[in-house]
Amino acid sequence: MSGACREVVTLQLGHYSNFIGTHWWNLQDAGLVYDADVPAGELQSDVLFREGLTLAGHVTYTPRLIAIDLKGSLQTLRKEGSLYDTENENSAFTWDGQIMTHQESPPSKNSFLQELDNLDTGGVLAESDFNHLTSSVDNCSVPGASVAVETINSSLERIQKSYRLEGSVRVWSDFLRLHLHPRTISVINQYNHDGESERLEVFGQGEALLQGQVLEDLEDRLHFFIEECDYLQGFQVLCDLTDGFSGLGSKVTEYLQDSYGGRGILTWGVAPVNHPDTSSMKDLYHMMNCALGTLQMANHSSLFCPLTLRGGLCRRPPPPTAFPLLNCDPLLWYHSSSVLALALDALTVSYRMRHCSATMWQLSDALTTSGRKVVSAYGSVPFPMMLGGCLPDALDAFSNAVPWRSLSACPEISDRRFCFSQSVTLKGVDEQSLVSRLLPGMEAPSPLHYERSGEDVLSAYVRSHYPSSPLAVQLVSSGSKVTPPFPQIFSPSLSAQGFLQSHSTPASPSCPPVSCLPVLTSLQSSPAVGLQLSELQRACASLDLRRVAPSFLTHGPEHAEISEYLEQLRNLAHCYRQSHSRSSSEEDDDD
């Protein structure tokens, strides 16, 4: 049974969080179907979206979202959005003297935003922007997923045009494809997004922000979205981990825990591979912010998970995570955030399903036993499966290797066959392809081909690698729709549906781009998390901040408090130890 819709409020804190969030909301928006005759999908969009009315009586469907960023971060996007006309409101004017008006030219919009505006006002794109209107777009394995009426969604889905926004994306609003509610965007004017002065760089600055007007503004926005919820299940928080937003996120999650106890708080601490205009001192700041933010947000959340393509969270990390079927530039935020958004789309499936969903607190309770509130994410983006193939064949192709790579900067461990618990999700493989198509009398290539359901196939495969771990499995046949403005970062060996082809297809105007992807993810509590936390704690504890970075202490916490926090981080890392997984270096830490 589907049961009642359990709503979620999303908070995005920081610029990179909003990069990931923008891609993630674009993916959700692309999956919406506006035809009432089409059967309801597997994912319940009302969990994330809210229905409303404009002053003119028009029905709106917008994210239940609070997005916080700094002054100068919006560019062409109005803070109040464009659903409600606020420019024509009359203002009382009492000055009788001479008035001089200075008009500043607005920032220019890229080609995607210009054409989106044209569609939004009822315009039609040029005929050259379309390529075989009805034949080139696949419906990502969802029966009847075509849109019967012309909408912005259906128009964007049919556009066979590569915008190549890599050179024009400066901020996250440069590729935002959906409308936001006027209560969504909150700008912190005390700090600048760009420039050399008034930057939000250290943990203590962020901690000190959540008071006065900033706190009142957050409370008002939360009350607005929460009061209209019938069955609020909790909050999903995306928070920048490497700058001062880690301190703000610590205070925001603490406020949510104190004010809405019993609701789930799933926090994703996000970090880009690189930062513009970085330096050795800023790299030190980034590492300290990661350590303090991880500890504090884990303390105040039901579950905390780092989400990044970085190879590690310390100052000199290994190379970033790469996926063989993606031509992704990890240094480009527009690219790296799109990969993380695809993974997040699958990682959050369990509490968004229409039927047999697990609530946020059920997911967190299963993964965070014995005080292990930090978990790690892994993904196969996209999941490599042959066009026309089956899931058992795709999994067998990995042989003894696991099919995913780290999305949490976790180190490799010698014994990968153990984890405390995990939740695995596969999106984008239709029901007919989940099991083997063996004819009677045929010998099965592997035990997976004997399984009779997709859940059994995936469970059997995962248990072969993690034989003693509690496991939850979710399957969703609809893939992630990567229509414009998602970057075309995909290997030419992928079909339009995101599956492997026997022969690579060179890019050409006659070949439709990839419009849908299968994705496999795993959310794990494992000893690898303990190794990561230990490495981060040791690197931070080895620094004498009073000597090498006294400016980090200017806004707090004090040096003694930081020492106490690092000791708590060390104790948290110890929670992930098992006698059979200890290394000699870890044993030394016990002394």
UniProtKB/Swiss-Prot annotation:
Subcellular location(s) per record: Mitochondrion outer membrane; Cytoplasm
GO BP, sorted A to Z: mitochondrion organization
Keyword RNA-binding: no
Cross-referenced Pfam families: Misat_Tub_SegII, Tubulin_3
Residues spanning the signal sequence: none
GO CC terms, sorted: cytoplasm; mitochondrial outer membrane; mitochondrion
Recorded superkingdom: Eukaryota
Alphabetized UniProt keyword annotations: Cytoplasm, Membrane, Mitochondrion, Mitochondrion outer membrane
UniProt family annotation: Belongs to the misato family.
Function: Involved in the regulation of mitochondrial distribution and morphology. Required for mitochondrial fusion and mitochondrial network formation.
Official protein name in the record: Protein misato homolog 1
Organism of origin: Danio rerio
